[in-house]
Amino acid sequence: MEHGEKNITIVDDQGNEQLCEVLFTFENEEFGKSYVLYYPIESKDDEEVEILASSFTPNEDGENGELFPIETDEEWDMIEETLNTFLADEDEE
């Protein structure tokens, strides 16, 4: 996982792979982390899309960074606020 990447493959606890499209990535200085918001590509156009979020650490070579779960309610609040701002900006365009 790296900033600017468009698709990522998520592997669940059972080893199932799911191709997802990256909505956007951002860094947050308060938490000192990079974050990625993404959604499953297989979602139907008429279905409500579930947007997922993870923190990530890019590898030194810039490829295949590791995703981590969001750990605190404060992080979730910050991510939700960032997403709402992003979606509001998209609606204005």
Curated annotation (Swiss-Prot):
NCBIfam families from the UniProt entry: PRK13678.1-2, PRK13678.1-4, PRK13678.2-2, PRK13678.2-4
Top-level division of the source organism's lineage: Bacteria
Record gene name: yrzB
HAMAP family named in the record: UPF0473
Protein's recorded name: UPF0473 protein YrzB
Family: Belongs to the UPF0473 family.
Organism, as annotated: Bacillus subtilis (strain 168)
